[in-house]
């Protein structure tokens, strides 16, 4: 099970939201690059970054910040948030992003996904489905799509998509456990590779999530639980007297 730390960027800062609510925002670091380096030093094998400003506006507001992160680290970076055109995808992939996540556009402009699959392999293009009670939400979770989550997944599957990033909005940022039943139901019906997201709070959640591997759930994105140090092993990664060093510590993880 690949564990992927999340970095959400809003107004140039590293933040976390509760259930996607922009009014419930907590700033963790002013510089998202520092956060990315911390996660890499803690041996992350991949990062999931969301441009929250872009999710709302469709403009690549934090492009330069993301470019700095991609240039600095030696691991794949997955990008989501407001990616709604071939040009945006090309700019990210040309920058060196490992793969892009298409969210709202999969609902509002499904033909775009078909075009993307003609230009790039499925390993580069994934679709993000953020669902509440089984219904995908779009445009920064502010609008309903009017279809079932698995229906959208099957449409994307027909276009050549092989992986879905699935978020149970009701669990995201709540620190109350992930949506086991909703994720299992979705994975069973979709028949695709699934990266679970939203609500994983502790090691027990990870163990439960691992039981869904037979249904295609092979990875998980973790946000707030990491930021709140909910995993005991994180205490070993921090130097509480001096603070974590971004340039060198006992980790063998490398920066470029």
Curated annotation (Swiss-Prot):
Pfam families: His_biosynth (PF00977). GO terms for molecular function: 1-(5-phosphoribosyl)-5-[(5-phosphoribosylamino)methylideneamino]imidazole-4-carboxamide isomerase activity. It catalyses: 1-(5-phospho-beta-D-ribosyl)-5-[(5-phospho-beta-D-ribosylamino)methylideneamino]imidazole-4-carboxamide = 5-[(5-phospho-1-deoxy-D-ribulos-1-ylimino)methylamino]-1-(5-phospho-beta-D-ribosyl)imidazole-4-carboxamide. The active site is at residues 8, 130. Keywords: Amino-acid biosynthesis, Cytoplasm, Histidine biosynthesis, Isomerase. GO terms for biological process: L-histidine biosynthetic process; L-tryptophan biosynthetic process. The keyword Cell membrane does not apply. Its EC number is 5.3.1.16. One of its GO terms (cellular component) is cytoplasm. It is found in: Cytoplasm. The keyword Cytoplasm applies. Pathway: Amino-acid biosynthesis; L-histidine biosynthesis; L-histidine from 5-phospho-alpha-D-ribose 1-diphosphate: step 4/9. NCBIfam families: 1-(5-phosphoribosyl)-5-[(5-phosphoribosylamino)methylideneamino]imidazole-4-carboxamide isomerase. PANTHER family: 1-(5-PHOSPHORIBOSYL)-5-[(5-PHOSPHORIBOSYLAMINO)METHYLIDENEAMINO] IMIDAZOLE-4-CARBOXAMIDE ISOMERASE. Belongs to the HisA/HisF family. This is 1-(5-phosphoribosyl)-5-[(5-phosphoribosylamino)methylideneamino] imidazole-4-carboxamide isomerase.
């Amino acid at each position: 099970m690949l564990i992927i730390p999340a970095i959400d960027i809003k107004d140039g800062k590293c933040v976390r939201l509760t259930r996607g609510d922009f009014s419930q925002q907590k700033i963790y670091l002013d510089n998202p690059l520092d956060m990315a380096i911390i996660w890499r030093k803690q041996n992350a094998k991949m990062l999931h970054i969301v441009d929250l400003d872009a999710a709302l506006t469709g403009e690549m507001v934090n492009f330069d910040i993301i470019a700095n992160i991609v240039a600095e680290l030696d691991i794949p970076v997955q990008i989501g948030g407001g990616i709604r055109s071939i040009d945006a995808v090309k700019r990210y992939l040309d920058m060196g992003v490992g793969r892009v996540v298409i969210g709202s556009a999969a609902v509002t402009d499904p033909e775009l996904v078909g075009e993307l699959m003609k230009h790039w392999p499925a390993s580069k293009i994934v679709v993000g489905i953020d669902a509440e009670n089984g219904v995908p939400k779009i445009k920064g979770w502010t609008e309903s799509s009017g279809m079932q989550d698995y229906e959208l997944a099957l449409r994307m599957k027909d276009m050549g998509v092989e992986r879905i990033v699935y978020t149970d909005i009701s669990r995201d940022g709540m620190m109350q456990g992930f949506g086991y039943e909703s994720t299992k139901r979705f994975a069973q019906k979709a028949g695709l590779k699934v990266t679970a997201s939203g609500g994983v709070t502790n090691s027990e959640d990870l163990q439960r999530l691992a039981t869904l591997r037979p249904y295609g759930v092979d990875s998980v994105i973790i946000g707030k639980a990491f930021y709140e140090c909910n995993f005991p092993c994180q205490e070993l990664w921090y130097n509480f007297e001096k603070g974590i060093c971004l340039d060198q510590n006992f980790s063998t993880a490398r920066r470029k």
